[in-house]
Amino acid sequence: MSIVKDMSLAPSGLQKIQWVRDFMPALSGIEERFRKEKPFAGLTIAVSVHLEAKTANLGLVLREGGADVHLTGCNPLSTQDDVAAAMAHLGVDTYGVHGVTPQEYEDLLVETLKCCPHLIVDDGGDLISLLGGPIWASGSSAAARRPLPAFTALSPGRRRASCPVP
């Protein structure tokens, strides 16, 4: 199940994603390898990134690697509604709407974590900061985030609890 602004925006998002796929040869090579090797077979991956065409492509590459991918935005102001709709159209559970309130944004993050991910990729640290609270995904074994944006999100005053995964 996805939560996006408007599924009728999907054609525009599909065009953007296709353009990126045509002009990102590094990920294309990785995708080819993942298609053959399926390194993420049987794993659920929650991905919190700026929800736009380049990062949507990353989600598709992870899916080619066998992962069950659940995608959300790491910043409601950078989420592109057409790309979110396109990903939902392509069968990737997507939780992202441009311009939501802080509470709605957190609700989208919570929805994403309901998949009980084995792995978490988090650009800003907001998704990881929810771990350890009442929505802790007990099957998670690792989380990765981009260091600088996550520094504030994961500082002791902002995080919900200690992060229970490496």
Model-derived regions: residue spans:
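N-terminal ligand-binding/catalytic initiation module
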Residues: 1-166
